[in-house]
């Protein structure tokens, strides 16, 4: 049921089932672990009878932002479709020519946390309020309405919330410092900013200083590739032949192609394939 929202454990079970059902075209393995020691699973899909060096490697990576659970579902759907339709002549041709590496959840800790509250970062332990206890003032659904609310200071009238100062997040103030939810279960690190290429070049959210208390919601981290999830992903890409890569998100309805940090330069050899990528992106959109 692709309309369902699966837990990370359920996704693990689905991956294992695909690998068990289609052993001739799949291989399931972990490329590393998260801060909370959840596996970063990769389902490799290809015709194993044909040598890997004769094929093009395609990466389908998803859920680097924990709350974007639908991106994981899209990656899982890709794996499901390729395996289910592997007897189809068209799909057979794909698996003869390509090795597809599907990593549906890059941020498993953030994925699980997002069932409590939408959480973009991973769960590197963080002491945001300085009491020497990581995550000592997490959010909680105090009123039991099924939502964790942002709290604003002001009168309960028709004033738009965007015009009111933020008081905190729904929390019983576990640490007793008068600031609600100022040490939540979040690292504040956006792992999509932490790769060692173009690290922190355009860390827009950080530069805007979006904070509650002293918590920056999205930063590039203290240094390039500080997070175990990103270290594992980069090492995987170094060790495998990845010729093309699709990273799946849910933030906007668009298809992005290189380069997002500078304009296209027709005289730059690195940009020779950009017109082709633009054409493919237009077809996908």
Segments and roles (model prediction):
Residues 1-285:
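M14 metallocarboxypeptidase catalytic domain recognition
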């Amino acid at each position: 049921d692709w309309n369902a929202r699966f837990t990370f454990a359920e996704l693990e079970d689905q991956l294992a089932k695909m690998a068990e059902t289609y052993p001739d075209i799949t291989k399931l393995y972990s490329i590393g672990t998260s801060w909370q020691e959840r596996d970063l699973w990769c389902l490799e899909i290809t015709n194993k009878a044909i040598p890997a060096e004769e094929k093009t490697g395609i990466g389908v990576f998803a859920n680097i932002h924990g709350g974007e659970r639908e991106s994981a579902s899209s990656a899982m759907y890709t794996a499901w479709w390729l395996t289910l339709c592997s007897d189809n002549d068209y799909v057979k041709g794909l698996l003869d020519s390509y090795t597809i590496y599907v990593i549906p959840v890059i941020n498993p800790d953030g994925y699980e946390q997002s069932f409590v509250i939408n959480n973009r970062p991973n769960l590197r332990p963080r002491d945001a309020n300085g009491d020497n206890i990581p995550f000592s003032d997490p959010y909680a659904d105090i009123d039991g309405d099924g939502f964790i609310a942002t709290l604003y200071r002001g009168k309960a009238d028709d004033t738009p919330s965007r015009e009111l100062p933020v008081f905190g997040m729904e929390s019983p103030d576990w640490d007793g410092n008068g600031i609600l939810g100022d040490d939540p279960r979040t690292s504040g690190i956006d792992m999509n900013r932490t790769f060692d290429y173009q690290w922190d070049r355009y860390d827009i959210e950080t530069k805007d200083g979006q904070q509650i208390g002293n918590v920056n919601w999205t930063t590039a981290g203290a240094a390039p590739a500080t997070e175990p999830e990103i270290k594992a992903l980069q090492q995987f890409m170094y060790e495998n032949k990845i010729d093309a890569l699709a990273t799946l998100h849910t933030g906007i309805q668009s298809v992005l192609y290189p380069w997002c940090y500078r304009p296209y330069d027709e005289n730059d050899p690195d940009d020779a394939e950009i017109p082709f990528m633009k054409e493919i992106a237009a077809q996908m959109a």
